[in-house]
Amino acid sequence: MPVIRFYDGSQQVYEHSVSLIEIIKNKKPSIMKSLIAISVNNHFSNLNTFIREDAFIEFVDQKNYKALNIIRYSCAQLLSYAIKNIWPLAQIATSNIIEDGFYCDIDFKRSISEKDLILLENQMKMLVKREYNILNKLISYSEAREIFQKCFEKYKVSLIDENINCNSKVSLYYHENYADIDIGLQVFNIKFCKYFKLQKIGGVYWKKNKNNKMLQRIYGTAWTNKQELDKHLDYLNELEKRDHRKIGKFLQLYHMQEESPGMIFWHNKGWIIFNELQNFVRVKLKEYKYEEVKTPLLIDKLIWKQSGHWDNYKNAIFTTLSEHREYCIKPMNCPGHVQIFNSRLKSYRDLPIRMAEFGSCHRNEPSGSLHGLMRVRNFTQDDAHIFCTREQVRSEINDCIKMIYDLYSTFHFKKILVKLSTRPEKRIGTDSLWNESEKDLSDMLIENHLSFEYQSGEGAFYGPKIEFILQDSLDRNWQCGTIQLDFYLPLRLSSFYINEKNEKKVPVIIHRAILGSIERFIGILIEECSGNLPTWLSPVQVVIISITDISSGYVKELFKKFSDVNIRIECDLRNEKIGFKIREHTLRRIPYILICGEKESSSKKISVRNRQGHNFGMIDVDFFIKKLQKEIITRNFYQMEE
């Protein structure tokens, strides 16, 4: 007499064993057309399955929040099936779902091209039209192993050997005659997998180990209906338009090349942006009473061992040898700042010491993870470390929060999300110290009227931290700012100060970053603004274009006038149509285009137009310069409107 419990909390009692089809007809017959899967006790079941014992049943239709992942799991193995149909000798390593889609890793004798993606996509569409049922079977370890050995699928055999006990059953899904290892619940029928798109090809090491073979990864996206798919593809199209790599190349801001992977060659225009950002942070450092320092790029490996960084991050640290000594190319600035603190005796009267650096850091990131300015091997961190007493912690955290919001307000991001990461299981320090420290951080957030989310167990082993996440206009989140308490590093590196009782005391270190990596922040800004940076950050702020040769003398006069007041200006005296020039400089994202013809020359005025296409008409030159200077000096995010 099985008792069937349903996801909505209801239940039904049957006098005898009952098939899932019968249960559906009794409970919710209308769902049959849109039913994509059934979960019995959290496991996939076929419609013809008979239930003989008490069970918990969930019907998953296309409106169910679980439907999307089920469809994506199915599409991942549909892709694997299509690959084997087209290239029988290709070896499927693994497939799975990711945010917004799915992927499949394959070992194939040649590089897969964009044309191949079209071929695979068409094959997948053809398979979907067959509307075949997907079957799930539980078989023995030895049977599963034999199936994949016969198909020469060495990666599947390896996965079974490493992850499944020889006495256990193996769950396989069958797409017609193609068998694959269960990666997640799949649809009953492939007809529910109509709305997908293959997107790109990447490279990944087998098991993420660089000593293993490099595989080719095919990425795709899948959705429950055409509207959602189209919406996502439009979103991706917008992302592509804003891609900082394309915009950076078009605007000649920087480039990267194979001979120096993950390292940036800044061109003049890009370096102007970099320096303007750095100078802006410098203004804030002075305002909040920081001292700027510079520490060496190479520091003996011994220091990194003492600090604990070597044991935790050695795979990401570049090293070099000189005169039988091994040096680390610094991946972060903190140990160097501690050396400055330790270089002379400190009294409690000297504290707090706020030490900031635009430190050039190097990290050996995997080549497959490198991505323009967003993920590099050499970056500049707007890093600071505050050495203070335990009693000064709250005040310093409060000032850090104010400084971060002060600086972020200039860039008008959609939203700033705040997360407080608390103690992990493995940690140093007493519970009372952690209680006090976490309360310090939460109280300061509350005092500043900031809503925040707890990230339980996500703090570092040496202290809790606050993360500041910028949400852009496309709803992407970028973690940039951090405030991190550290009880560990000053102990490891023997830092101390003399307190009022003439005793040695260990200071607390507060790690503080605002932009994080300057390079990455520039990438974020370029994408947020589609390259239309605010005037104060724009490499060229004004361009003067001549209409005829007659006005070229006045153009040169204006060029000098603007240059003399440090406005970044170019002039265009080419013998081209005025419409062509305006379009070209608009595409170059120059904030203001000044048009100079006979009328302007004779009246000693200028016609002004901004890059949005707003025409200000003919105005007085000095008046425009004054307004432009105000926009630049105040670091206004928006252009003048009149």
From Swiss-Prot:
The keyword Transmembrane helix does not apply. It is an enzyme of class 6 (ligase). It is found in: Cytoplasm. Its cofactor is Zn(2+). Zn(2+) binds at residues 334, 385, 511. The keyword Metal-binding applies. One of its GO terms (biological process) is threonyl-tRNA aminoacylation. One of its GO terms (molecular function) is threonine-tRNA ligase activity. Keywords: Aminoacyl-tRNA synthetase, ATP-binding, Cytoplasm, Ligase, Metal-binding, Nucleotide-binding, Protein biosynthesis, RNA-binding, tRNA-binding, Zinc. Binds 1 zinc ion per subunit. Residues 243-534 are annotated as: Catalytic. Residues 1-61 form the TGS domain. Pfam families: HGTP_anticodon, tRNA-synt_2b, tRNA_SAD. Its EC number is 6.1.1.3. It catalyses: tRNA(Thr) + L-threonine + ATP = L-threonyl-tRNA(Thr) + AMP + diphosphate + H(+). Transmembrane segments: none annotated. Its main location: cytoplasm. GO terms for cellular component: cytosol. Homodimer. Belongs to the class-II aminoacyl-tRNA synthetase family. HAMAP family: Thr_tRNA_synth. Catalyzes the attachment of threonine to tRNA(Thr) in a two-step reaction: L-threonine is first activated by ATP to form Thr-AMP and then transferred to the acceptor end of tRNA(Thr). Also edits incorrectly charged L-seryl-tRNA(Thr). This is Threonine--tRNA ligase. It comes from Buchnera aphidicola subsp. Acyrthosiphon pisum (strain APS). The lineage of its organism: Bacteria, Pseudomonadati, Pseudomonadota, Gammaproteobacteria, Enterobacterales.
